[in-house]
A protein has these predicted regions:
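Extended, compositionally biased accessory segments flanking or bridging domains
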Residues: 1-25
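Short amphipathic alpha-helical interaction segments
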Residues: 109-125, 130
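Short amphipathic alpha-helical interface segments
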Residues: 92-116
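Short, loop-centered acidic/histidine patches that primarily coordinate divalent metals
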Residues: 79, 111, 133
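Amphipathic alpha-helical interaction surfaces in cytosolic regulatory modules
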Residues: 19-44, 49-98
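A short acidic, often aromatic-flanked loop/helix-cap motif at beta-alpha or helix-coil junctions
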Residues: 12-13, 82-84, 106
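Preference for short coil/turn "hinge" residues that link or interrupt alpha-helices
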Residues: 4, 45-48, 121
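Short, cationic-aromatic polyanion-contact patches
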Residues: 130-141
Length: 141
């Protein structure tokens, strides 16, 4: 089962006011705790960052890196280049990887060793398959 999460909606529920930015560690912690309750026992989570204006390193660490200790596979969509700039160094620092749905398919973000493990897990769970070009395509969401 894939647990879907609208990160912007969770942010709105977690922090008073019309915030669209994931900044500060306390904000990240509040959002992550709500997400953890929503995805309890789900091995795969799907997080949509559409509507999130920006995310800083501390929130990327609190949300993405710490959730990867809870779920086996984390799928992200609606990720902008600005989001990537905060998320990628956090993944590198923790030797973790996530799967990003892009306009052209799937991309695994993280160090090569962690990325290879995530790709293998996607194939094993039949969440993705290899295309004729050798890339991965999502089969379930």
């Amino acid at each position: 089962m894939i647990a879907p999460i609208d990160v912007h909606a969770v942010l709105q529920e977690s922090v008073p006011g019309p915030y669209a930015a994931l900044v500060t560690r306390p904000t990240g912690r509040a959002v992550r705790e709500r997400i953890e309750r929503a995805i309890a026992d789900a091995p795969v989570a799907w997080m949509d960052f559409s509507g999130v204006r920006c995310i800083d390193y501390s929130c990327a660490d609190e949300i993405v890196a710490k959730l990867l200790r809870t779920v086996e596979i984390l799928l992200l969509k609606g990720v902008t280049e600005a989001h990537r700039l905060a998320i990628e160094p956090v993944l590198q620092g923790h030797n973790l990887a996530v799967v990003i749905l892009t306009g052209t398919g799937l991309e695994v973000l993280g160090p090569p060793e962690a990325a290879a493990l995530v790709c293998e897990e996607l194939l094993t769970r039949r969440l993705a398959e290899r295309t004729a070009g050798g890339t991965l395509a999502l089969t379930a969401a």
